[in-house]
Amino acid sequence: MFMTPDQQDAKKGILLAISAYTMWGIAPIYFKALGAVSALEILSHRVVWSFVLLAVLIHLGRRWRSVVGVVHTPRKFWLLLVTALLVGGNWLIFIWSINANHMLDASLGYYINPLLNVLLGMLFLGERLRKLQWFAVALAAIGVGIQLVVFGSVPIVAIALATSFGFYGLLRKKIQVDAQTGLFLETLFMLPAAAIYLIWLADTPTSDMALNTWQLNLLLVCAGVVTTLPLLCFTGAAARLKLSTLGFFQYIGPSLMFLLAVLVYGEAFTSDKAITFAFIWSALVIFSVDGLKAGHAARRAR
């Protein structure tokens, strides 16, 4: 069947979106394979090798002018320094949660994230919430509240992941720097701390790459690919798809994490988690229905 250029572009965008969110969803398999390495050490390798790969990509794409332009814009420079701290913290919490058998909490965090984004948009960008959006956010809050009050536990990992990534997304939206340039500068800001840790501070059986097996070293170097490849797929998808369309793929990642946690790694799906997940899933269904209704209304208005 013949497809127009726009349809071909949209099809490519859908494939890129599925690829990006699938890679994010199965990333825990990679981090589980590095279970013998400390979270801080994995984070440091992630920063170093992501920086190296991004530097190569920027050089090949002749994008150094874009990098220099951001560095010479104080507002963007300092905001990127803040986003570097946020994404670094997010990466560290995520790596720790996977290797400490808290993958369900990580999954919950990324389910909560779209709802938190709506709330942050209202608080900091002047966006107005529709009634169903309010209802969805309230349901999510009730789910977390029940876990706190009835079961006496707080999903700290989930809240930390959702909050750090939510504020990261908010600031990156304000900065308006392309993903590749932004992530390159963020890893550049984190590079000194990562290098100091790996060279002088790390004192573990895996910290000396000269003594590691080549298989382990290859896994550590692949941290750059694991970080950068899904991001490139995501930015390619974002350039080809409407934001509303892209939004429906964002649940692939946490859903795959959830399935991995329960079916592959045997994490306990306890009653407190089940209730919280039920409320979050219900909130996301309402959130998605509201998005569909808003999209149809906008098309009719045109």
From Swiss-Prot:
One of its GO terms (cellular component) is plasma membrane. Belongs to the EamA transporter family. PANTHER family: ACYL-MALONYL CONDENSING ENZYME-RELATED, SOLUTE CARRIER FAMILY 35 MEMBER G2-RELATED. The keyword Ribonucleoprotein does not apply. It comes from the Bacteria. This is Uncharacterized transporter VC_0195. Residues 22-149 form the EamA domain. It is a multi-pass membrane protein. Keywords: Cell membrane, Membrane, Transmembrane, Transmembrane helix, Transport. Coiled coil: none annotated. Its main location: membrane. The chain crosses the membrane at residues 13-32, 42-64, 77-96, 106-125, 132-150, 154-171, 183-202, 217-239, 246-265, 275-297. It is found in: Cell membrane.
